[in-house]
A protein has these predicted regions:
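Beta1/beta-strand and adjacent pyrophosphate-binding region of the FAD-binding site
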Residues: 1-9
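N-terminal Rossmann-fold NAD(P) dinucleotide-binding loop
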Residues: 12-13
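Active-site substrate-recognition segment that forms the wall
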Residues: 44-45, 50, 54-94, 221-224, ...
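Flavin (FAD/FMN) cofactor-binding core of flavoprotein oxidoreductases
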Residues: 139-144, 164-173, 261-262, 270, ...
């Protein structure tokens, strides 16, 4: 039996590898082929603390002050209203206290398994140095904002992660980077992938060693009786793990999935005086996260809802560069600019399961900001599902039929 996994971001690669290691014959279909998926441009943050779905009463109340036009990170481009308005209506419906509580319970369970799954993955691919488990920082520019932020995070459900006030030693290190930092907190139990390029190469090597065939090109799905087929590829079972491209692929089987492109932006500059061993730093009032990769430092942020194929907005990159100057960060240009589309569903939960419309179709997509974090555990869950093993987590709340 041959299983085709469509999508070569971290969710797709993790799924293909997990299946191959269980003895399955696997073909990985890479529709992009250029590492342009969100997996390869994110902050590298293993975000075990992000238990609360962004579809929440608090988020809805905060929308006006978060708008990009007012200096915030959230952009709802007027020319793309046809793309984001239906999504926004569904998000509002998913933001009731009851649905938020249910979603938090699901994410808490998934995120509790994220770090153990990452440990297993880096051991499997022979690259344990890729996983750093030394937490991350959140910093603020005033004492009042730091006190408010610390209180909010200490009252929040952070799952298996723990939050404490940053030590004086930590603050001294952070102030070398940005003298205006007035206060900060330090998370433990979260982590970082130290180098996304190294991760991509290590995954390709592991896939090859496991016998996975990688096919570059677009997957075209069609109906074949009670199941689905991919044009030009002989596969008995198909897993859709194509990020934002999953919406069109699922539509071929009759699923109408309200998946939207939640686009993020980053800039990368030379590391200069940024320490090699410093954990990622979130500047919460600027809604950005700063991560060192090898000799580069990446600054990432923004939530732009709209079409995946819309031209990038240069104002986002310009604002990130302005934040670097305003915070006096030791990151030197010229900056490399990148934009990618996070695949997001209105309740901010992923979709993982088996199709009710095609007997041989399975799916794993919609991980929003948590694609990198949840990729290894998602791959294991899908492998459980296809091998007939009861998944360690109840997947019913993640079925696409919830929409």
């Amino acid at each position: 039996m041959t299983i085709a996994v469509v999508g070569a971001g971290m969710v797709g690669r993790s799924t293909a590898l997990a299946l191959a290691l269980r003895g399955e014959r696997v073909v990985l279909v890479d529709p992009m082929g250029d590492r342009s998926a969100a997996s390869w441009g994110n902050a590298g943050h293993i975000a075990t603390e992000q238990v609360a779905p962004l579809a929440s009463p608090a988020m809805v109340r905060s929308v006006p002050r978060r708008l990009f036009a007012l200096g915030g990170p959230l952009d709802l481009p007027p020319r793309q209203i046809a793309a984001w308005l239906p999504f926004a209506v569904r998000l509002l419906a998913a933001s009731t206290p009851a649905r938020f509580a249910a979603g938090s319970a699901v994410l808490r369970t998934l995120l509790a398994q994220a770090m153990p799954a990452w440990r297993r993955l880096v051991a499997t691919i022979g690259a344990p140095e890729l996983l750093r488990e030394d937490g991350h920082f959140v910093a603020w520019p005033t004492g009042d904002s730091a006190a408010t932020g610390l209180a909010a995070w200490q009252a929040a459900d952070t799952g298996t992660a723990r939050v404490d006030a940053a030590s004086e030693q930590d603050l001294a290190r952070l102030r070398i980077l940005s003298p205006g930092i007035a206060g900060a907190i330090r998370f433990s139990g979260s982590g970082q992938v130290s180098d996304l390029d190294h991760l991509a190469a290590a995954m390709e090597g592991a896939l090859s060693a496991a016998g996975v065939a990688i096919v570059r090109g677009t997957a075209v799905l069609g109906r074949d009786g009670a199941g689905m087929v991919i044009r030009g590829i002989a596969a008995d079972r198909i897993v859709i793990a194509a990020g934002i491209g999953s919406r069109a692929l699922m539509a071929a089987a009759g699923h109408r999935v309200p998946l939207i492109a939640e686009r993020g932006y980053h800039i990368r500059g030379s590391a200069d005086r940024w320490p090699h061993d410093l954990s990622p730093v979130v500047f919460e009032e600027h809604a950005m996260i700063v991560t060192r990769y090898a000799d580069r430092v990446q600054i990432a942020g923004f939530v732009e809802l709209g079409r995946a194929d819309a031209p990038p907005d240069p104002r986002k990159w310009a604002r990130l560069e302005r934040h670097v100057r305003d915070l006096d960060l030791p990151v030197a240009g010229p900056f490399r600019r990148w934009m990618g589309a996070r695949p997001t569903l209105p309740d901010y939960l992923p979709a993982i399961g088996g199709s009710t419309r095609a007997d041989n179709l399975f799916y794993a997509f919609g991980h929003q900001h948590l694609g990198l974090t949840l990729a290894p555990i998602t791959g294991e869950l899908v492998a459980d599902l296809l091998s007939g093993t009861a998944p360690a987590i109840n997947l019913a709340p993640l079925a696409v039929e919830r929409f």
